[in-house]
Every structure is written in C-alpha cells, then in structure tokens.
Regions:
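Post-HExxH zinc-binding segment in Zn-dependent metallohydrolases
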Residues: 291-300, 326-327, 338-389, 595
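Non-catalytic architectural context of zinc metalloproteases
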Residues: 34, 47, 59-61, 81-267, ...
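Juxtacatalytic substrate-recognition/specificity segment
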Residues: 58, 220-346, 352
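Bacterial N-terminal signal peptides that target proteins for export
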Residues: 1-11
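Intrinsic-disorder/low-complexity, polar/charged segments enriched in Ser/Thr/Lys/Arg/Asp/Glu/Gln
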Residues: 39-41, 53-57, 66-68, 112, ...
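Bacterial N-terminal signal peptides
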Residues: 9-20
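C-terminal recognition in membrane/secretory proteostasis and scaffolding
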Residues: 357, 367-636
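Early extracytoplasmic/domain-onset interaction patches
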Residues: 26-75
C-alpha cells in the first residue's frame, strides 16, 4: 500500500469538498413528479416580423433561495439536442420586486441559469428575445412579412426540479394587426392584437405550435365530426391557398383512411398547419394534436409533380399522432426537455411512420399508386447501394440525429445517415408481406397497426413501448420468430438492402435507361440530375457534383463532392450531353472524359464506364400475388 503525504491527503479532501456543492446542485436539478406551485405567465410579442425578433416576458412564482431556470434542450421530433440553437436566445434579464437579479449559467449545463432569490420576492420576471434566423445559413426561417411559426420551446424558461407535465403555463401571444392563427391551444379571447390561451402544462404547450399569417385559410376536413380536423394554411400570397375540390377531398380521405387503419384518435381536435411559402423554410415536424407542414407555394398549382412530398410530409406527420406521439418509445419518455433522449426505436417511430405515411397517402388518393411503386423502387435502389452497411448497422443509425444533428455529410453512402426512416420502411414492408404470406393473406400489418397504435381511443398521455412489446404485438397478429426477424435486419450487414418484402409482394427491382416520372419529379424538386447508379454522383443546377457514391466509378476516379463539371468529352457540360455520353460509351470502348474545377484547380478525369444509364423501377414477378396492390387498396 502506497502511503500519501499530508499535503496529498489535504489536496484530496479539498477536492472532495469542492465536489459536494456541484453534486448537490445537480441533485437540485433532477426533476420530481410533483406539482410546481403556481402558474407561469408567458407573454410573447411576435409583431416584429421584419427583423424576425420575438420578445418574451415571463412571470414565474418563486420562493427565497437558489432557483434554476432551464432553456429547453431536447426536442422530441428532432431526436437530438438540435431544435433551436441556444445561440439565438439573447437579452436575458431577471428581476424581483423591480430589482435586478443577477443570474449565472451553470458550469456543467449551458442550458441552465442559476439565480439567488432574495427573501420577500414571490415572483421573478424574466425578459429576453428569441432572435430567429434572418438568413438560411443560420437555421430555418420561421418568420416572414406574411407568416410566422410559434415554437414555444424557443420562447420560454422553466423551473428545474419538476416533471414537465406538472408545470403549468398561461400563454399569450401578440401578433401583427389583422393576422389570423391556428394551433392546438385553446383560446380564451383576444384583446387587440393579443391572443390569450387557456392554462396548459409545459409538455402540451411545447407540443402545440401556432401558425399565423396575413393570408390565412381554414378548411374543415371532417365536417360534422365530434372531433374536428382542420387544414389551416398560411401563404405568401392569397392565391396560393386555393385548392381544387379533388385536392381537398384527398386530404379529407387521408383522415378517414387513418381512422379506418387505427380505429382511434388521440386528440381533441387536429390541425394540419401548413405554410405555403418560398421564404418560410421550416419543413415540418410532428405533434399529437397538430402537424407542421412547410411546402412550396405551388403545392396546389403543381399538384401532380409534388406527390412524393405530400406522402413524405403531410401524411407522415399525421401518422405520427399515433406512432411517435401517442405510442412512444419508452426510452423517449423523459421527465422534461433537458433530460437526454435515447433513440433506439426510431426504426419504429420513424420507419413505421414512413411506411404508413406512404400507404395511407396512396389509399387516400393523396398520391397515385404508380407513384408509390416508383418511389419504393427509388428507396430500394438507394439503400441497396448504401455500401456503408458493411461496417454500420441500421440499428446504429438511430444514433445519427445526436451525432450529426443533420449537418451535411461528405460521404453519406459510406457514413450512412438517418437510414432508419426509409430502410426502416423496407423492413415494415417485409413484415407486412410476411404476415400476409404466413396467414394466407387473411391478416396483415393493418392488424398490427390497430392492435398496437390504435389502443385506448381518446387517450392523450403517451403510452411507452419496448422492443419486446413490438415483438409481442406482431406475434399476437401472426405467430413467428419476429425477434430474430427484426434483429437480423436491424443488426445485419447485408449484402444489400432488405428487399424480401418487395419480392414477397410480387415485384422485383430492375434498372432501365429511362427514369420514372417519380424519379424525374424528384430530380426537378431537388434541382439535381442523378447519375447515382451509373457514374455514381448527382449534378446540381450549377454543375456541382453532389453525393459521390463510395466505390462508384466516380469515386474510383478520385472525385468528391464540390467539383464543378465544366465539360464532357471536350464539350461544355449539359446534363443531356452527359446522358448521351454515358449511352454512347455503352457500345464503345473509349472512357468518358470529364473536365472539372475544384477551387482554383482544373482536372481532367477519364472514367472507364460502359454500362449505360441506370434508373430504378419495379416490375412484376409473373405468377405471384400482387400484394402491393392489396396494400395500397383503400380500406372500406
């Protein structure tokens, strides 16, 4: 045993003593399932849309002593501490009895603000601003001269030490003159430009965004129903708000097909919050009683070319009311918004939602069945070429939101991204067709959806689940080795994507020289010409290479994203010229010559590729049942 000197002993004791206040401070932050005494008054002034500045005033009941206020860190739909950047929170001043109270940021948690409340102070007033992005490189634009979104998690502080559902707020909101608004919160009245809402707990408040705008239109999607469902739209121009009767009917059918699938609802009313804008850039996120949908101004006017976007967004966010918000992974049932989430079951939360979003969208007529097939082909091809599965399992990609927080990746085909969305969808198609096959087409994943997500009709409180719960629910529909079935697909390394569900549905993935309409629409929407399955890259409208595929011909030639393509075989680059060169090389022996620029360097690369253009499609397997047709069939 090594003896210590008196000086060493004193040093150790002093370090231990210094650690005690830190431990005690962290213990004080730990949430407890007890009611917060009093109601927090929250006033948000959102009238300065020109500068996109939101001013906030809070009055928080307090008692004398140390108090910690938290700024929300974790956002459920983002699956990470992404959400709104703490750097956009500014101007914090705390006062008590009109005297300024100095706050100090917690040394172990930058989202926590400590303040010593003097004796005799019963309320602390907090004033600050949320400086929402003014340019796209700062984050999503949530305020324009015509519209705004209120995300309460960016606009409040809340006391540490309590479960979120035990902290009550009384919110109010000041809007620009003559603007109209919608959201899940219940209004108690308006006084001038200020709207007052009923008291609500913190968990429900953060799950209840408000959309408001100069040009606003509400459409009842379930007329006469006891539980209303509305499409609430704000737009850059009033003309953007006009849809045809057939287009509106597709949204109404979406609601009915979801009800027929799940047999339940978990909201008092539901609002499809939709921003039709080329300036507002917040894409979308799910909530239990509403869904945010950021679409282009041409949502209605260019209807046929935006089918994928409707199923990837509008129906997807609606399905989340059941899958993700009501039924929620147990490791995401945290006590407040500053406790870390765990994302192990995102292949259910997002993967199954992606599957049902496409299926229910097709059943409702929101998307054509042929487009859904072509979209499925594109998904299958993308993940069949996702070479990164050789080292990284799909299960591990559920950590991706926390790792990258959706920052761009240089080599996504090798690194992998949030693959649990679309590859998760392939797994659920696999499960659906397996149930149909084993049951002689008497049962399907529809039965799982009703039995797992459709329980306890009308309940709002989240109901957690584990991997074992998913397996048990599948076995209740169709006995099978579901645990090993799922784990093989979640933990495996290929080769290739899990495409058994496509084959079992009576189709197979092939490649032809002609893109599908779906593929062309996606290229137009992304402003990219996609050569992923031939040369191994995409080219944007400026000629820049994007998403160079790992181990593709382009990769082997030494190319990366960021190169600008200047010429093809000695002629100025055009997308059609490159397509023609790839086609010509299919019957010749000469390599394809590309002149490119990266920064101030010019390079010429000769790619020895002779296999033609390749675009994914699904074709029928003769003599097999067409289970895809059955899956997309509207429920009666």
């Amino acid at each position: 045993m090594r003896l210590r000197t008196p000086r060493q002993v004193l040093l150790i004791l002093s370090l231990l003593a210094a650690a005690v206040p830190v431990v005690n401070a962290q213990e004080a932050l730990r949430p407890r399932d007890q009611p917060f005494p009093g109601i927090i008054e929250l006033q948000v002034d959102a009238t300065n849309v020109g500068q996109k500045i939101f001013k906030v005033h809070e009055r928080i009941p307090v008692k004398a002593g140390r108090m910690t206020l938290l700024y929300p860190k974790w956002r459920l739909g983002a699956h990470s501490p992404a959400g709104f950047a703490l750097s956009q929170f500014a101007g914090l001043v705390l006062t008590g009895n009109q005297q300024r109270l100095e706050w100090k940021r917690d040394p172990l948690d930058v989202y926590a603000f400590n303040v010593d409340v003097p004796a005799g102070v019963t309320h602390v007033d907090a004033d600050f601003e949320f400086l929402s992005p003014v340019e796209r490189n700062q984050g999503a634009i949530v305020a324009t001269p015509e519209m705004l979104a209120i995300h309460w998690e960016a606009l409040l502080l809340y006391p540490a030490g309590f479960y979120a559902h035990r902290v009550i707020f009384r919110p109010s909101l000041a809007l620009p003159p003559d603007w109209k608004f919608a959201g899940a919160l219940e209004s108690t009245g308006e006084a001038g430009a200020e709207v007052r809402f009923k008291p609500v707990n913190l968990e429900e408040l953060i799950d209840s965004p408000i959309y408001a705008g100069r040009y606003f239109k509400r459409i009842d999607l379930d007329p006469g129903a006891k539980v209303p469902v509305f499409l609430d739209m704000v737009a850059d121009n009033p003309g953007n708000l006009e849809g045809t009767p057939q287009q509106i009917q597709a949204h109404r059918a979406l609601v009915q097909q979801a009800y027929k699938l799940f047999g339940s609802h978990h909201y008092d009313h539901y609002d499809f919050l939709m921003a039709l804008s080329d300036e507002f850039t917040f894409a979308g996120i799910e909530h239990q009683q509403s869904g945010e949908n950021g679409v282009r101004t041409t949502y209605f006017s260019d209807w046929d070319r935006q089918q994928a976007w409707r199923s990837n967004l509008v129906s997807h966010e609606y399905i989340h009311s059941w899958d993700g918000k009501f039924r929620r992974p147990a490791d995401q049932l945290t006590a407040n918004f500053n406790m870390p989430l765990q994302d192990s079951l995102l292949w259910v939360y997002e993967g199954a939602t992606s599957y049902w979003g496409h299926v229910v969208g097709a059943r409702a007529g929101l998307v054509e069945v042929s487009q859904m097939r072509d979209g499925l082909a594109a998904t299958a091809a993308l993940y069949d070429h996702r070479i990164g599965r050789s080292w990284r399992s799909l299960q591990d990609t559920t950590n991706e939101p926390i790792i990258t927080q959706r920052r761009p990746l240089g080599w996504v085909s090798w690194q992998r991204a949030e693959d649990y969305y679309s590859e998760g969808e392939l797994i659920w198609l696999d499960a659906d067709t397996k149930i149909r096959e084993l049951s002689g087409d008497k049962r399907s994943l529809d039965d799982f959806a009703r039995g797992f997500f459709g329980v306890q009709d009308g309940r709002h409180e989240p109901l957690g689940y584990t991997f074992r719960d998913v397996v048990d629910a599948l076995n209740a529909v169709q006995p099978f080795e579901w645990a090993s079935f799922l784990r093989a697909r979640l933990d495996g390394h290929g080769p290739g994507a899990p495409l058994d569900g496509i084959a079992r549905s009576g189709w197979k993935l092939v490649y032809t020289e002609q893109p599908s309409n779906f593929f062309k629409d996606e290229e137009a929407y992304r402003k990219v010409t996609d050569f992923s399955y031939s040369l191994g890259f995409g080219v944007d409208s400026d000629g820049r290479l994007v998403n160079v595929v790992w181990d593709s011909p382009a990769f082997k030639a030494g190319l990366t994203g960021g190169y600008t393509l200047l010429a093809v075989n000695g002629r100025a680059f055009k997308a059609e010229l490159l397509k023609a060169a790839i086609t010509a090389a299919n019957s010749g022996s000469e390599p394809i010559e590309l002149l490119l620029r990266k920064d101030d360097r010019y390079v010429t690369e000769r790619i020895d590729y002779h296999d033609g253009l390749k675009y994914p499609h699904l074709v029928r397997i003769e003599g097999t049942p067409d289970r895809l047709a059955e899956i997309f069939q509207p429920l009666k």
